[in-house]
Each structure stands twice: as structure tokens, then as C-alpha cells.
Design a protein with these regions (language model features):
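Conserved donor NDP-sugar-binding/catalytic core segment of glycosyltransferases
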Residues: 5-42
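Acidic donor-binding loop at a coil-to-helix junction in glycosyltransferase catalytic cores
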Residues: 87-94
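Conserved catalytic-core segment of nucleotide-activated headgroup transferases in glycan assembly
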Residues: 150-151, 157, 424-432, 436-439, ...
Length: 716
């Protein structure tokens, strides 16, 4: 929509510069639900009403690509919107075609184009995927650059680079669904465009962070960034100018584990120099009480740096040291034989701040002293006194809750059990039902996040005394007092009553619990970032197959002693001797690109996107097929359809005429089924456990491989 008086303001201004420009732009403001309005970076250049020369390099980032414009009504200029089907760059091309005639643009500060970013039917999340437009986009970029017959004006470099950079950030640039040969060719085409851009187009872009700048420079064929390692100083130069310098490295502490007499620190090192160095040119060195040793490293998941693909190769590592006594730990980075110190910085799971100067994990107190991490073994009394003293740094309800939790933990041994709000129960429930029987002095509570209509069927009267509502004041107290947390779903939001890691910061020193990730299926989707040892809050993980052990160790970098090979609790409740009925279970998984995230861990289906998708069309064709119905009738078989909880509302959208195709409820007895059909559901391993046949049916395989879902590969 347009703000009042926008049209009059723009037309009045256009009349004053009519002979000078063919196009006048005005402010576009992006609105998204209740978030503050967002302004495009072009308004750092367009600061006042006037005419801007697009041949001037300082105006290269105006990048007029939307239709917040007013143009001359000149039917003879032959410039129209490109109406080619699925072109998707029609606004951008139209603006480019008009502006290149005079290389000038007018800007009027009055008026506003109000752009609703909260539109659930926006095409950005779907048809802007490279699955649909990579070839179209590249052809447009290449034709635009080639049309200049030589050096491309900086303004048009900025247009194309801006498209590349935001698509990389949103993971909408690279065509992952291509074959390896096609993918390599696609990357060469991108690099050929970068070759025609000035370095300033990359370095000076107002919306590209430091690490992305070095990623793009490292890809530019005619740019050769060089790392210069001097005594006490490290720098990067490109074509004779310095583009980075530092004398130390930021080292980000992610987690500290303490177990079996050892402390284990998990960290990664940040620096753009890793974009321009080979693996053999650097080392990570630990100094424990003055004794130095080189550490083994792996590529950190934080190498993506505000993207979905790695833009740099940050080294991550574990450093072990004794848990008893007192120890001083420092780290150094060696670049071509020269050592540089590190600055220790804390991440959410290992927080030091102005108010939190120490914390204790399993009997070991950690403090920071400049560039040194100091560890010291302490008993429960010293831990208690230190935490009470630290509470004095807080006020009001935070201080009150802290002190209550410190006192409660001192007198009680608390263990908590969780599933997720999207399911009635899972492995957290089964583990709770098993453990609550023990009389060992431990207080056990199942944290529930939905109301149960059949509570007496799920829990005995005694067990109901140990149910605590998620997010309640009692949950907060127990969470801060807990010694062990068992959860079927990873992350902070499924377990924390404070909503996020940020909400836990005032209490971070009190979170001295071990997290046992029970899982809710056998991990086989490639979720390297989400489930990595660096990101997933899990001290131990229950695994169910030798494949899973190798997968977690190799691809997710978990040490072997973090894995518990007992199998998921729910497998104890599967009767492998039960005879199957004449029924087939069809359980497709959900799709991120057909939903919207309401808040963390909560997704909502968008009906309009679902109904227009290949995912829905192909599933409908299958479920509504007369041939299928006849086959089911002929074999006296029923097909039960179990939709993922996130897309369960879609069951009313199918037009199924056969009584032999049945929409199943949230819970099914898998022993009843002779066969299982799915795309990626982890239920597949439950049927493997039963030794029942499995059939894969992926209705949108191309979109899946292109990365439109939240993963694009399987680890199988």
C-alpha cells in the first residue's frame, strides 16, 4: 500500500526534474507483523531529495529493484515489463532498462511504499528457490553484463552482487539439485560474474558482513587476497591494499563438560584469515599449566556465519585437562610458524558477563583471568557460597528465583523429563515411566506442555503428582535446580521455561545439569548444523543403531563416550512377535517451505502453498487414485495415512473416495502394519526394527534436493 499523499508528492517532484531523469524512486518500508519497520540499505546513499548520478561509484548501492517508482509515460521508448513465464526479475530488469539510458535517478523523500513482509503467500520462500530460477537468474545477469561490451558500470555491478549476496545468505543461490558436473559449471558462471566486478563492489557493500566479504573475494578469479604473518601482527592484503589486520584471535567457548575426572572444553576460532589459508598453514595450540600441545580440529558449524553454507573454515576443537586441582588454560594460533594469542569469549552455554564472573560444572569452578581460563575443583559448600554471592549482582524476581533454586538444589536431587508440545508423548514419557519406579532419593518430574484428555490412561495417580506444567513457576525452580534433564527433542526452547538461551542469561551459572538427549527417532536426515556437538545442548545421546554411532562421531563430531548405545525407550514397547494385519501405514514428513514459523519450535501449515505444491499434488494423486483403491479392495488391505503433527490439519484437503484409505490419528500401533511407506520419516527405523518392508515415495524430490526443506540430504 501507499502512504497518504504519496502520488501527489512524487508527481510534484518529478515535474521539477522531468528533463533530467526518466525514473523517480521513493522510500519503501518493510513491515513484518509486530517487528519494527525495516529500511533498505539504499537509504544510506539516498539521504535527501535530489538527482543521483549512477556513473558515480559512490551511488553503486542504490540498487533500485522494486516498483516503488514513478516513470515517464513514454510509449515510444519500447521499454516494458518482461512477461516471460517464471522470469521473476521483471521489476529489476524494468528499472535497469530505464535507468541505463540516462544513468540518473531521482529520489523524493516524501511518500512511502509499504511492503508487507508478513504475507504468507510471498513467492520468496518458494519460487525464488534456485530449483525454479537459477538458470533464469544467471541468464539475466550474464545478458546484462555482456550488454555493456566491456567494463560493467559500478551501479549494475551492485545490482547483480546484491542479488548474489542475499541469495547466498538465504540459501537461495546454489543449485544443489544439479549433478556434480552441472553444479561445478554453475559455480563457474557465478565466478565469471564476480570477475567483472570491482573489489569495492564487494568490500564496501553496506549489508555484507566481514566473513562474507572474504568469501566473495576468495571466489573472485582475478582477486588474490594474501595473508601476511608478521611478528605480533597478522593482516590480509588484496591487490596492494590492506583489507584486514589483527594481533589476536577471538576464541569462542561453546561448552564445558566435566566427567570422570576430566574437563573438556569445546571451542572454535573466528577469523577471516581462514578464508585464505590452506589447512597446513595453521595450527591450534593449547597451553595447560604452561605445557603446550597441538589440538586436533574439525570444521565448525559456525563457519556458515549468518548463512546456510560455509563461507569460511573456522577450526573447532576439544581441549581436555584434569578436573581436579587448579589449572590455567590458554590458547594460541600458529600461522606459518608464528604464534598469536587468543581472546576467550563466552557463548550462551558458557557465559561470563559483568554479573556472572564464575560458574561451577560438576564440581569444577571456572573463571576468566584475561586471556586465561582458570579451573579449580570445589565442593558443594563452596559452590553454594559462590552462587549465593553472585546472586547479589541481581535484583528483584531474578535474585529471588536464583536464591530459591540454589537452596532447593542443595536439599533435593531433581531430574526432569520432556517431550514436545506437538506430540502427546514420546521417549521422554517412556523414560519417565521407567525411572519413576526407582526409590533412590531422586525427585523425578515429567514436564507437560499440553492438556491430556486421557490422563488416567497415561499416568497413575502417584505419577500425576510428578507432572509439572511447562513454563510454570515450579518448572522454573526445578529447571534451575535440576541435575539431569532427559529430553526427546534437542535445543533450548523444548526444555527451558525461559524461552531461549537469552532468557537464561541471568541464571546461566546455575544450569549445572547434564542433558540426556533421548531422541524421537534415529537421526538420518543430514542436519549437520542443528545437531552438531557445537550447537545441540546434549551431554549424552541415546542411539539405536551402529550406523547412528558412526554418523554422530563422523558427521556431528561427538566423542564416543557421549553416546549411549541402549536404543530408544519406545523400542521396549514394540512387540516384534505380534502378527500384522492387512494394513499399510503411509506417514509422510512435513516441509519447511510449506509452513511458517510462529515461534521457536512451532510451525504452522500454509494451506494455499500446500495446495499449489508438487508435494500435495503428488500425494493427492496417489491417495485419490482409483487404481490404488481397486488394488486395496482386491487384496483386502487398508492404507492408513498418518500425517506429521505440523501438517495434520491438511487431512481435510484430500478428496478420497475409498473407505480403504483411512486418516489415522496421532497414535498408531505400528505392529499392526505389514508395510510402511514414507519419504523421510524416522519411523522407517521402527519398521526396520520390526523387520517389515519399507517403500520410499518422495513427491517433491527435486525441491528436496534443492534445499527447499530444512535439509536436503540423508546421512544414510
Amino acid at each position: 500500500t501507499l502512504a497518504p499523499d504519496t502520488v501527489k508528492s512524487i508527481v510534484d517532484y518529478f515535474d521539477t526534474v522531468y528533463d533530467e531523469v526518466d525514473l523517480v524512486t521513493y522510500r519503501i518500508t518493510q513491515y513484518f507483523k509486530n517487528a519494527p519497520p525495516v529500511y533498505h540499505f539504499r537509504y544510506r546513499t539516498l539521504t535527501h531529495t535530489g538527482v543521483y548520478d549512477l556513473d558515480d561509484p559512490k551511488n553503486r548501492f542504490i540498487t533500485q529493484t522494486n516498483v516503488n517508482i514513478c516513470v515517464k509515460n513514454d510509449k515510444n521508448n519500447g521499454i516494458f515489463f518482461d512477461e516471460s513465464p517464471n522470469f521473476r526479475h521483471e521489476d529489476e530488469k524494468y528499472c535497469c532498462d530505464i535507468l541505463r539510458r540516462k544513468m540518473k535517478i531521482g529520489f523524493c523523500q516524501k511518500g512511502e511504499y509499504r511492503y508487507n513482509r508478513g504475507n504468507e503467500n510471498s513467492i520468496v520462500s518458494t519460487v525464488f528457490s534456485p530449483y525454479y530460477i537459477f538458470e533464469t537468474s544467471m541468464a539475466f545477469y550474464e545478458e546484462l553484463f555482456n550488454s555493456f561490451g566491456g567494463r560493467v558500470p559500478p551501479y549494475f555491478q551492485g545490482i547483480v552482487f546484491n542479488d548474489l549476496r542475499w541469495k547466498l545468505k538465504e540459501d537461495k543461490l546454489l543449485p544443489y539439485h544439479y549433478s556434480p558436473e552441472e553444479f561445478a559449471r554453475a559455480n563457474r558462471r557465478i565466478d565469471a560474474l564476480l570477475k567483472q566486478m570491482d573489489e569495492d563492489t564487494i568490500i564496501l557493500h553496506p549489508s555484507v558482513n566481514e566473513y562474507h566479504i572474504h568469501y566473495w573475494l576468495s571466489r573472485k578469479p582475478n582477486c588474490h587476497p594474501t595473508v601476511i604473518a608478521d611478528d605480533g601482527k597478522l593482516s590480509i592484503a588484496a591487490d596492494g591494499r590492506k583489507i584486514f589486520s589483527a594481533s589476536s584471535f577471538p576464541l569462542m567457548m561453546r561448552k564445558i563438560f566435566v566427567e570422570n575426572g576430566k574437563a573438556r572444553l569445546l571451542s572454535f576460532v573466528k577469523s577471516p584469515v581462514f578464508s585464505h589459508l590452506g589447512r597446513g598453514e595453521w595450527k591450534v595450540i593449547a597451553s595447560v599449566d604452561g605445557e603446550k600441545r597441538e589440538l586436533e580440529t574439525f570444521t565448525s558449524v559456525f563457519s556458515a556465519q549468518d548463512s546456510a553454507v560455509n563461507v569460511v573454515d573456522f577450526p573447532a576443537f576439544f581441549c581436555e585437562f584434569p578436573a581436579d586441582g587448579r589449572h590455567e588454560i590458554k590458547f594460541f594460533i600458529s600461522i606459518r610458524g608464528k604464534e598469536y594469542p587468543t581472546n576467550l569469549l563466552a557463548e550462551p552455554t558458557a557465559v561470563f558477563s559483568r554479573k556472572i564472573r564464575m560458574y561451577v560444572r560438576n564440581g569444577v569452578m571456572f573463571t576468566l583471568n584475561g586471556r586465561t581460563l582458570v579451573s579449580r575443583s570445589v565442593d558443594e559448600n563452596e559452590k553454594y557460597r559462590a552462587e549465593r554471592e553472585q546472586s547479589k549482582n541481581f535484583k528483584g524476581n531474578v535474585k529471588k528465583l536464583r536464591n530459591a533454586a540454589i537452596e532447593y538444589r542443595r536439599a533435593h536431587k531433581v531430574e526432569l523429563y520432556y517431550d514436545l508440545h506437538t506430540v502427546d508423548f514420546d521417549n521422554g514419557y517412556y523414560q519417565f515411566k521407567n525411572d519413576i519406579k526407582h526409590s533412590d532419593g531422586v525427585e523425578r518430574y515429567y514436564i507437560y506442555s499440553r492438556e491430556y484428555k486421557n490422563i488416567d490412561e497415561l499416568f497413575t495417580k502417584d505419577e500425576q503428582e510428578h507432572l509439572v506444567k511447562f513454563g510454570s513457576e515450579k518448572h522454573k525452580l526445578l529447571y534451575l535446580s535440576a541435575r539431569v534433564i532427559f529430553t526427546a527433542f534437542y535445543g533450548v526452547t523444548p526444555v527451558s521455561p525461559f524461552g531461549s538461551a537469552a532468557g537464561e542469561v541471568p541464571y546461566s551459572d546455575l544450569l549445572d545439569f547434564k542433558t540426556i538427549y533421548l531422541q524421537h527417532g534415529v537421526l538420518h536426515a543430514s542436519l549437520r548444523s542443528q545437531n552438531s556437538v557445537e550447537r545441540c545442548r546434549a551431554d549424552k545421546i541415546v542411539i539405536s543403531a551402529p550406523f547412528e554411532k558412526q554418523n554422530y562421531m563422523t558427521n556431528y563430531h561427538y566423542p564416543e563416550d557421549n553416546l549411549i548405545p541402549t536404543g530408544m525407550a519406545r523400542y521396549d514397547h514394540i512387540d516384534r512377535s505380534k502378527k500384522a494385519k492387512n494394513r499399510i501405514l503411509f506417514a509422510p514428513s512435513w516441509r519447511k517451505y510449506l509452513t511458517q514459523e510462529i515461534n521457536s519450535s512451532k510451525w504452522e501449515l500454509i494451506d494455499s502453498k500446500l495446495k499449489s505444491s508438487d508435494y500435495f499434488r503428488n500425494f493427492s494423486r496417489f491417495l485419490e487414485s482409483e487404481e490404488l483403491h481397486e488394488l486395496l479392495e482386491k487384496t483386502d488391505t487398508y492404507l492408513d495415512v498418518k500425517l506429521h503433527p505440523i501438517i495434520a490439519d491438511a487431512e481435510g484437503l484430500f478428496d478420497i473416495k475409498s473407505p480403504r484409505v483411512v486418516m489415522a490419528g496421532a497414535h498408531v500401533d505400528i505392529e499392526n502394519y505389514k508395510m510402511f511407506i514414507t519419504d523421510f520419516s524416522s519411523f522407517v527405523f521402527d519398521f526396520a526394527y520390526l523387520c517389515r518392508p519399507v517403500l520410499y515415495f518422495v513427491p517433491d524430490y527435486g525441491q528436496f534436493k534443492a534445499g527447499m526443506n530444512h535439509y536436503r540430504e540423508l546421512d544414510l
